[in-house]
């Protein structure tokens, strides 16, 4: 089922999510709905709080991006164990419709999480999948991609976003 995407400045986007203790039918339905919502919005990643659910769950599917390796993941209670290198990439966000900003992130990350079956997974992500993972992990921590900007860059991005919001009304 496609759910509504929470739009910034909704408060849920500013609060850290809660760890998932039990992967029950409700969580499995959430995961299915997250994929449905992400595909409908033509995104490549989605955090649960972006559809109003304050749980530490993300879904990623990089296959729509032609120049990225196809990767489909469900990650529950994810964390970065290690990061290396730096990469700048112009990111968009489903919770900031129409806005894209250049953000610096790790080029490569080692990740621990649970999969949709509750099994521990360790992954090494590099390039675009690493960027998507870090973007979604930030959401789960209550951080948006605009929060990664400093000074005038942040101010300009927020001003541009306000104009985009007004033009949508």
UniProtKB/Swiss-Prot annotation:
Role noted for this protein: Removes the formyl group from the N-terminal Met of newly synthesized proteins. Requires at least a dipeptide for an efficient rate of reaction. N-terminal L-methionine is a prerequisite for activity but the enzyme has broad specificity at other positions.
Required cofactor names: Fe(2+)
Matching PANTHER family: PEPTIDE DEFORMYLASE
Annotated CDD domains: Pep_deformylase
InterPro entries hit by this protein: Peptide_deformylase, Peptide_deformylase_sf
GO molecular function per UniProt: metal ion binding; peptide deformylase activity
Cytoplasm listed as a keyword: no
Family statement drawn from the similarity comment of this UniProt entry: Belongs to the polypeptide deformylase family.
The name this protein goes by in its record: Peptide deformylase
SUPFAM superfamilies on file: Peptide deformylase
Chain segments annotated as coiled-coil in the UniProt record: none
Reactions it catalyzes: N-terminal N-formyl-L-methionyl-[peptide] + H2O = N-terminal L-methionyl-[peptide] + formate
Gene3D superfamilies linked to this entry: Peptide deformylase
Residues that, per the record, bind Fe cation: 93, 135, 139
Cofactor remark from the record: Binds 1 Fe(2+) ion.
Encoding gene, per UniProt annotation: def
GO biological process: co-translational protein modification; translation
Positions annotated as active site in the UniProt record: 136
HAMAP family cross-referenced by the UniProt entry: Pep_deformylase
EC number from the UniProt entry: 3.5.1.88
Species, as recorded: Aquifex aeolicus (strain VF5)
Keyword Metal-binding belongs to the record: yes
Keyword entries, A-Z: Hydrolase, Iron, Metal-binding, Protein biosynthesis
NCBIfam families referenced in this protein's UniProt entry, alphabetically: pept_deformyl, PRK00150.1-3
């Amino acid at each position: 089922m496609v759910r509504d995407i929470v739009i910034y400045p909704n408060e849920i986007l500013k609060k850290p999510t809660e760890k998932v203790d039990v992967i029950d039918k409700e969580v499995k339905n959430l995961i299915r709905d997250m994929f449905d919502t992400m595909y409908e919005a033509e995104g490549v990643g989605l955090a649960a709080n972006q559809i109003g659910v304050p749980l530490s769950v993300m879904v990623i599917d990089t296959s729509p991006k032609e120049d990225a390796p196809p990767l489909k993941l469900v990650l529950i209670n994810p964390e970065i164990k290690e990061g290396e290198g730096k990469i700048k990439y112009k990111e968009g966000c489903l919770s900031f419709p129409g806005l894209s900003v250049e953000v610096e992130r790790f080029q490569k990350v080692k990740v621990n999480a649970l999969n949709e079956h509750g099994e521990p997974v360790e992954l090494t992500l590099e390039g675009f999948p690493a960027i998507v993972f870090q973007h979604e992990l930030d959401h789960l921590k209550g951080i948006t991609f605009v929060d990664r900007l400093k000074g005038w860059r942040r101010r300009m991005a927020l001003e541009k976003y306000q104009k985009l919001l007004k033009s949508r009304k």
